[in-house]
Amino acid sequence: MKAPVRVAVTGAAGQIGYSLLFRIASGEMLGKDQPVILHLLDLPQAQTALKGVMMELEDCAFPLLAGMVATDDPNVAFKDVKVALLVGARPRSKGMERKDLLEANGAIFTVQGKALNDHAARDVKVLVVGNPANTNAWIAMKSAPDLDPKNFTAMLRLDHNRALSQIAAKTGKPVASIEKLAVWGNHSPTMYADYRFATIDGQSVKAMINDDVWNRDVFLPTVGKRGAAIIEARGLSSAASAANAAIDHIRDWVLGTNGKWVTMGVPSDGSYGIPEGVMYGVPVVCENGEYKRVEGLEIDAFSRERMDLTLAELEEERAAIAHLFG
């Protein structure tokens, strides 16, 4: 049996946490041969609820669950962790301006970034799920100067998976047969899901669908506003699908994608006209525990416009919290 890996989950007593923890403990994220020790972080007022979740985790008798730590202190939560899923974030309350939301999360992710910097394993893989995910990931990265910026990622896998399912429904093909989908930009309604390069059994998805009006007026708005549609229908934000996307993201990053494209929010290297350092969704392939962006894709006029639109939103978010970094 391998030595256990320490995995931190923040917001562990929350809705996404509840959908996530049992799947991590069962081996779905890091493999069925990899024991884990869960480091569970949540607010002081959530510690009792967190104990209840831990009781349930114990009651599953997962062979791979080698231990658990519950805490409200990020310095304890991130000690020696190899994987950190930053799920907890300040939700937007009624009447709250986006600027205030950015500010509140700025404080949270500055503290967590610093704690990761001081206590996590040097090769820690960080995934930010809590919204606004790209900007929160950027804040955490900036607050951890001793860690490689490449260690920090934002979750665009939910947008990616949402886009896959819409394409499968439109073409009548199985979702697993779709390859080479890309999602660009921010995890927000401005994201740009791009199937120009996608194939199903070697055939072009763009040629199969062959409908630019559907792409612009149905597909992109449906994927972009899917989170809002779920809140409208269920009265709660998407939790199980977000947890599923987080599992997919980390599993692929750690275990590899076998040459398949997936989408991750990563610090830009300056390619595709995206300024260096911006936390931006791009297509990647993963192998040997590292992601490599897919290079050399042609960007047409419509794509450029959509990619610049989502970039502008990211730069606006970043400007709103720039004062946190002097």
From Swiss-Prot:
Q: What GO biological process terms does the UniProt entry carry, in alphabetical order?
A: malate metabolic process; tricarboxylic acid cycle
Q: Which residues bind NAD(+)?
A: 11-17, 105, 112, 129-131
Question: Any idea which UniProt keywords this protein has?
Answer: NAD, Oxidoreductase, Tricarboxylic acid cycle
Tell me which Gene3D superfamilies the record gives.
Answer: Lactate dehydrogenase/glycoside hydrolase, family 4, C-terminal (3.90.110.10), NAD(P)-binding Rossmann-like Domain (3.40.50.720)
As recorded in UniProt, its EC number(s) are 1.1.1.37
Catalytic activity of the protein? (S)-malate + NAD(+) = oxaloacetate + NADH + H(+)
Example GO molecular function: L-malate dehydrogenase (NAD+) activity
UniProt binding sites for substrate: 92, 98, 131, 162
Catalytic residues in the record: 187
Q: What is the main EC category here?
A: oxidoreductase
Q: Could you tell me the superkingdom of the organism this chain comes from?
A: Bacteria
**Which InterPro entries does the record cross-reference, listed alphabetically?**
L-lactate/malate_DH (IPR001557), Lactate/malate_DH_C (IPR022383), Lactate/malate_DH_N (IPR001236), Lactate_DH/Glyco_Ohase_4_C (IPR015955), Malate_DH_type2 (IPR010945), NAD(P)-bd_dom_sf (IPR036291)
Role summary: Catalyzes the reversible oxidation of malate to oxaloacetate.
Q: Which family does it belong to?
A: Belongs to the LDH/MDH superfamily. MDH type 2 family.
- Protein name as annotated: Malate dehydrogenase
Species assigned in the record? Chromobacterium violaceum (strain ATCC 12472 / DSM 30191 / JCM 1249 / CCUG 213 / NBRC 12614 / NCIMB 9131 / NCTC 9757 / MK)
Q: What taxonomic ancestry is recorded?
A: Bacteria, Pseudomonadati, Pseudomonadota, Betaproteobacteria, Neisseriales
